[in-house]
Amino acid sequence: MTQTAHPDTVLIVDFGSQVTQLIARRVRESGVYCEIVPFQSAEEGFHRLKPKAVILSGSPASTLDTGSPRAPSVIFDSGLPVFGICYGQQTMCAQLGGKVESGHHREFGRAFLEVEKDCPLFDGLWSLGSRHQVWMSHGDRVTALPEGFEVVATSSNAPFAFIADEKRKYYAVQFHPEVVHTPDGAKLIANFVHKIAGITGDWTMSAYRAKAVEAIRKQVGDKKVICALSGGVDSSVAALLIHEAVGDQLTCILVDHGLMRKDEAANVVAMFKEHYNLHLLHIDASDRFIGELEGVSDPETKRKIIGRLFIEVFEEEAKKLGGADFLAQGTLYPDVIESVSFTGGPSVTIKSHHNVGGLPERMNMQLVEPLRELFKDEVRVLGRELGLPESFIGRHPFPGPGLAIRCPGGITREKLEILREADAIYLDEIRKAGLYDAIWQAFAVLLPVQTVGVMGDGRTYEFVCALRAVTSVDGMTADFYHYDMEFLGRAATRIINEVRGINRVVYDVTSKPPGTIEWE
C-alpha cells in the first residue's frame, strides 16, 4: 500500500469495526504513521510494515463464535507493545489464556470509568481515583484475565474495562478511545504510541510533501502525466503535488459537463493558470452531456450517462495530446481501505475514481496516486502546504454528477440554469452570515413540482426549491443544520425575487439516516 517506507509505523489490525478509520486518524494526529490491515492479511502486513506497535480494533463479531477473527500469533510473539480496543481486548484475552463470556448487561453509549491503579497510559492525563467519561459499545465482556494482566480501571458494567500487562506492554480497553464521545481517548492513543511504544513521530504533511515529490519523480521519470481536474480538493492537491515534482510533464484536463456550480469551471481554470502556471485544458462538453441527459429522470441512469460520457470525452482529449504514460488519480486512503475490505480480504484492484473508471486499462496507462496514503483532513493540510487558497481547501463536497442529481426528475437546460442561480444565492447568503465553515455541505435542489403563487398582481405557477444543509464529521451520518428562521426567510426571499422560475422555497430537515445527504 505504501509508496515509501516508514521507519516508525503502527499496524492497526481491522476486525471489521465501523470506526477503525478513526483509530488511524488519532494515531496520525499524534504525528505517527499507521496502516490499517484486515485481520485475514495481518501476518503478511506485520512482516511487510515491520511496525513498532500494534493496535487491535473492535468488531461486530463475537470471540465466542466458531471461526471468529483472531490476531496472528506473530504479534504476541514479537515483544511489541499491543493495544486492544473492545473486540481487540476480548480476542487478546481469549488468545492469551483469559476468558470471555456473553454479557448479561449490554453496554452501549456513555459510561464512566473509575481509575483504580496508576498506569503509564494515564501519564499526564488521569490520576488514581479519578472518574472519566468513555463510550461503550459491547455485548460480550472479559470475565477472567490472562496471566500477567491486572485491572487499572472499571465501569459499572465492565469490571475489566481497562487492563494492562505492563511487563509485556500489553494494554486493552473495553471502551472506544477513538471516538469523540471519549473525551480523553485521543490522548490515551497518543500516550500509547509515544510513551509506551517510544515512537517520536515524524508524520507531518511537510515531510510527506517532500517524500511524495521524490516518489513521483522516481516513478514518472521523464514521461508525461495527465490528470482529470475537477476543482475539488483531492484532484487539485494531487495536480499541484505532481506539478511540483515534474512541472510541464503534467497536463490537466477539466471536462466541463455543464453540471457545475455557477462560474465554477471558469474560476478553477483562472486559479490554476494564473497562480500555478499549470498546463490546463478546459473542454466545454456541456452540449454533449446535457443533450444526452435531457428528459432522463432515473438517477442511476443519469449517473451512468455522465460516467460514460466523461470517459469518452477524457479519452478523446488525452489521445489528442499523445504520448502520456501516466494517469493521475486522487485516490485517498479510505478508498484503499475499502478495496481491501474486512469481508472480502485482500484485493489487488484498487477502487476506481468515479470519474476515470476504466481509463488506465483502456488507454494502457499507469496510475500515479500521490494521495493514496492520506485521509481527507490530511489532504486539506497538504493543500495549505502547497499554497492552495482556503476558498478551495474548505469547499463543501460536490458530487461527480453535479447538478444532475440535485434536479430530481427530467433534466432540461432551463431547469439547470434555474437551479444554478438559486444555489449561488443560497451559498452567498451562507457566506455573508459567516456560516459556511460551520456547515459540512449546503446546496439547493430544484424539485419536479410546480405550485401556485402570487407575484405582483399576477398568478404564477413555478418550481419549488428545497434548501439543504447538514453538519457531519465524515459524511457517514449527518444532521440537518439548525438555521434561525430569519436566515431562512432572507435566503428564500432573495431566491424567489431574483430567480425567475421559482415561487416557493422549503427547507429539508431530514437527518442521515434515514435520508441521504444528496436527494439522488
Swiss-Prot record:
Domain of life from the UniProt record: Bacteria
EC number(s) reported in the record: 6.3.5.2
Molecular functions (GO terms): ATP binding; GMP synthase activity
Domain Glutamine amidotransferase type-1: 9-202
Signal peptide (residue range): none
Keyword Nucleotide-binding found: yes
Gene Ontology CC terms, in alphabetical order: cytosol
This protein's UniProt keywords: ATP-binding, Glutamine amidotransferase, GMP biosynthesis, Ligase, Nucleotide-binding, Purine biosynthesis
Residues at which ATP binds: S230, G231, G232, V233, D234, S235, S236
Catalysed reactions, as listed in the record: XMP + L-glutamine + ATP + H2O = GMP + L-glutamate + AMP + diphosphate + 2 H(+)
Pathway where it operates: Purine metabolism; GMP biosynthesis; GMP from XMP (L-Gln route): step 1/1
Record PANTHER family: GMP SYNTHASE [GLUTAMINE-HYDROLYZING], GMP SYNTHASE-RELATED
HAMAP family: GMP_synthase (MF_00344)
Record text on subunit structure and interactions: Homodimer.
Stated name of the protein: GMP synthase [glutamine-hydrolyzing]
